[in-house]
Amino acid sequence: MKLHQGLVCLSVLILLPTCILGDRKFEVYWNIPTFMCPDQNKTIMDLNKKHGVIQNTEDLFRGDKISLLYHPGAFPAITRNKTTNTLIYENGGVPQAGNLSLHLKLLEKDINEQITDKNFSGLAVIDFELWRPIFRQNGGSLSDYQNLSLKLEKDLHPEFNEDQLRKEAERRIEKFGRSFIKQTLIKAKKLRPKAQWGYYAFPYCFNGRRRYVDTCIPSAKIDNDRILYMFENSDVIYPAVYLQTDLAQKNQTGLVKGRVDEAVRMAKMVKKPAKPPVLVYHRYVFTDTLEYISKENTTAVFKAMKDNGADGVIIWGSSFDLNSKEKCAKFLDYLREVLWPVIDEVKRS
């Protein structure tokens, strides 16, 4: 596996790199539901192979090369009833009130159903975005997790003042959150030991705007140091870089640099001889408009990933992008005019 210091990577189990001196190899993985495009999908599979893109056999969305699991098991969660606008607490709502044994039991069921091959050796990505294992990161749209955590402590300790309540809420959500995060990886690796497990989007960086463009905000680095246990139990680190139209190109590449730098930093901190490689999730459209990202911008973004130490990119797409014949035809044109030429250029560089 890559040590992030100007190395060349030879494939182990086809997927993951091991290193010798020289230029680094940059892998490209396909996580787009192009099986929804029956008129184009054979052409896409054939040309992906020609351009060195790693894709599941038969264009399956979950297959032999990569499987993305959305909220597997029974992570504690707070959802909202859309009709009554009332909160629903699933498995306790927050980790300190959750049943870890129940979660692990249902996790095993989900993994057995979604990754049926016990010898699966591809990328296994856990997409977990319900809450964060750091208390202060559960603000804004995630503030229900802070509020419930504080309420639980107030019920347990009515004599506590506000500062004491907050400190105890922080301590407990992070303690039990760590158990859910870590034990999920341990269980997953026991069930599919050859798979390359990791959590989608971590480490968070919160960069791209104002003063912190090409580096994480300072508190994010402190927080990531505190969740080193996640990366020490991961086989791969999967940060995410999605773009919006209001970011200038220099800020787009800065966004990439900051997030890749942080992922590489965490990989280097892992106390193992073989450091986890960094594979960056990227969407080929702007998330605010769903317009295709230009060839110029895509080239700059992919080169920024490679230049800053990423081992590869996972190109992700939504079913919404490909839910009509017109969209499928347009996407094939985009592949021919933009993505495949960019992939060739970045692999050569």
UniProtKB/Swiss-Prot annotation:
Principal place of residence: secreted
Source organism, top-level taxon: Eukaryota
Tissue specificity statement from the Swiss-Prot or TrEMBL entry: Expressed in salivary glands.
Compartmental location: Secreted
Pfam families named among the record's database cross-references: Glyco_hydro_56
Signal peptide start and end residues: 1-25
GO cellular component, one term: extracellular region
Glycosylated sites: 41, 81, 99, 119, 147, 251, 297
Molecular function GO terms recorded: hyalurononglucosaminidase activity
UniProt keyword annotation of Transport present: no
Keyword field: Allergen, Disulfide bond, Glycoprotein, Glycosidase, Hydrolase, Secreted, Signal
Reaction catalyzed: Random hydrolysis of (1->4)-linkages between N-acetyl-beta-D-glucosamine and D-glucuronate residues in hyaluronate
Function comment: Hydrolyzes high molecular weight hyaluronic acid to produce small oligosaccharides.
Family: Belongs to the glycosyl hydrolase 56 family.
Protein name: Hyaluronidase Tab y 2.0101
The organism of origin for this protein: Tabanus yao (Horsefly)
